[in-house]
Every structure is written in structure tokens, then in C-alpha cells.
Amino acid sequence: MRYGFVRKKHRGLFLTTVAALPIWNPISEFVKWYKSHKLSQHCIRICGHLCQKHLDMFLSVIGQRWPIDVFSSVFDHQVSAIGSDIIWWFLKLFLVSFFFFF
């Protein structure tokens, strides 16, 4: 039986490898960046069309469940890096969920 393009005997190894990737690090960096630099309305629209209240609730839950890493870089130099990390994190999340459900 096949799960996407990964055979059943290789599925555990594939999922273990994906799970070992540091997928929460970009989220913790984003939480730290958000808390130090309040997002503008334009950035809130980019981040999934969430209103300010829901975004605050979402980030507070993530901040309570996962430790926030030290994020010492300056905002202007890290905008593109944070955006690419968030996109990469969602891509990895999609891949894991794809292999669990299909």
C-alpha cells in the first residue's frame, strides 16, 4: 500500500525525518519579533487575514506552549527571512498532514 509517494515500510522513517526538522523555531522567532515590533495592518493581512485580537490570542498560546528563542536581529534586516521561514514551516506542516491523511 502506498501513502502518496512513500511506501508503507518507509513511511515511519520519512515522518520521523520531517518531525525532526526544527519547525517550531520560525514560529518562536515570529512570536518574539511580533512582541517587540507590533504588526501593522498590512502585515496582519499578509499573515492569514487575522484580526488583531485573534492574532494576539494565537501568539499567546504559542508563546505559552513553546519556549521563545532569543531573537536579537534588527527588524529591517529580518523581514524577508521571517517570511520565508513561516512559508517553509507551513509547507512542512502541509507535507506531514498530507502523508497522515492520504
UniProtKB/Swiss-Prot annotation:
Domain of life, per lineage: Eukaryota
Keyword field: Endoplasmic reticulum, Membrane, Transmembrane, Transmembrane helix
Primary localisation category: endoplasmic reticulum
Tissue specificity statement from the Swiss-Prot or TrEMBL entry: Expressed in placenta with lower expression in brain, kidney and testis.
Localization per record: Endoplasmic reticulum membrane
Keyword Membrane: yes
This protein's GO CC annotations: endoplasmic reticulum membrane
Membrane-spanning parts: 13-33, 82-102
Keyword Membrane: yes
Membrane topology: Multi-pass membrane protein
S-S pairs: none
Protein name (record): Protein PAPPAS
